[in-house]
Regions:
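Conserved beta-strand-loop-alpha-helix junction that forms the acyl-donor binding cleft
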Residues: 11-14, 35-37
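Ser/Thr-centric signal marking residues that sit
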Residues: 8, 22, 83
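Conserved active-site tyrosine of GNAT-family acetyltransferases
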Residues: 17-22, 93, 120
């Protein structure tokens, strides 16, 4: 089976990005490894099962990269955070100070609201109307 394991998100600062994604969005810090060049390999994940797509938080190194922080998709929603309990996660994120750009709405495809991360990248918080048809990750504890 093939899957997208990581997506790179260029950030201003490793530690402030880790704080936002773990504290405000409830992600887990999967890896934070120093590299010989002084950079770090930092991965956060929205799930604890290790089967989702992680975010590689890459600190901007030059002006070109700094210019992309917060605008990696040209102002479009570029990231989609699925939930199985929209009201719970919306309330938790609101309490954590996440900036929502609109009121929650109910569409034919599910409950959705656009929010932005600490740098301004746009995300959808989405509870699909129809459960995800993809098979669930294997239950490794049953082996």
């Amino acid at each position: 089976m093939k899957r997208v394991a990581l997506v790179t998100l260029v950030v201003d600062d490793y530690d402030e990005a880790i704080r936002f994604y773990t504290e405000a969005l409830g992600f887990r810090l999967a890896e934070d490894t120093p590299r010989p060049d002084g950079s770090r390999w930092v991965v956060v994940e929205p799930s604890t099962d290790g089967h989702g797509t992680g975010l590689l938080l890459a600190q901007a190194k030059d002006e070109a990269q700094r210019g992309r922080v917060g605008d990696q998709t040209g102002g479009r929603v570029g990231f989609f955070l699925h939930t199985d309990d929209f009201a719970r996660d919306h309330a938790r994120m609101t309490a954590a100070g996440v900036t929502f750009l609109e009121e929650p709405r109910h569409e034919t495809y599910g409950s959705v609201v656009v929010f932005q991360d600490l740098y301004g990248n746009r995300w959808d918080l989405l509870q699909p109307a129809v459960p995800d048809p993809r098979p669930a990750a294997p239950d490794e504890s049953a082996q």
